[in-house]
Amino acid sequence: RPGFCELPAAKGLCKAHKPAFYYNKDSHRCQKFIYGGCGGNANRFRTIDECNRTCVG
């Protein structure tokens, strides 16, 4: 799995409320979070399937 999958969920600095998914390294699964729309990090996916393919395997 790519190293960025280990990063925490990062909402970013903007104030949008966009549903997104991130890989939770503690639970070893992808989870939903609210993305602010800018900034953040690479551990952010538009769909849970994309997250699972990239970080779960």
From Swiss-Prot:
The keyword DNA repair does not apply. Disulfide bonds join C5-C55, C14-C38, C30-C51. Its main location: secreted. The lineage of its organism: Eukaryota, Metazoa, Chordata, Craniata, Vertebrata. PROSITE patterns: BPTI_KUNITZ_1, BPTI_KUNITZ_2. GO terms for cellular component: extracellular space. SUPFAM superfamilies: BPTI-like. This is Kunitz-type serine protease inhibitor. Residues 5-55 form the BPTI/Kunitz inhibitor domain. Transmembrane segments: none annotated. GO terms for molecular function: serine-type endopeptidase inhibitor activity. Belongs to the venom Kunitz-type family. It is found in: Secreted.
